[in-house]
Amino acid sequence: MGMPPGDEILTHRLILPRDANHHGTLYAGVLLSMALEAAYATSYRAAGLNANLVLKRVLDLRCHEPVRIGQVVEFRGREVHRARAQVVVALYGTPLPGRSSPWLDAMMQFVQVGDSGRPEPLEGEATAPPADLLPPWLALRDRASRLLAIRS
């Protein structure tokens, strides 16, 4: 098994001019790439060192605040759901200076695959989702559960 339940993975990124759009704020394509990196790092740690994960789908990604060039952003990541061959991680963008709410939140679903590219069970036993999740993880897990019920 990977990281102990309750552990968070932190990812920090400096927003550079090459990351910006014509408004001088974080470009959506770069945002998606950064979020995917943070989510993959979180899912990899959750699944264990022998993980061979692929992104199945972005369940939800919301950017609540524009991020300017020169700001350092923090992604907090945590596993919020696990099944036989998949792990769902949530991301929470730590509030920017002078703000009280997150600049971003997201949920992404990753699947463990074998050499054939087909799903394979994750290492260790499937665990029930923690019942004692604290904010913001409880709300993100509940939102992910509703979105998982929608088949793509």
Regions found by a protein language model. Give the residues of each.
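Catalytic strand-loop segment that frames the active site of acyl-thioester-processing enzymes
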Residues: M1-Y27, A131-S152
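Hydrophobic beta-strand-centered segment that forms part of the acyl-chain substrate-binding groove
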Residues: P4, Y40-R76, V80-V87, S101-A106
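Generic structural detector for well-ordered beta-strands
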Residues: H12-I15, R62, Q109
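Short strand-loop-strand
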Residues: G24, R62, G117
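A glycine-rich, hydrophobic loop/mini-helix early in the fold
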Residues: A35-E37
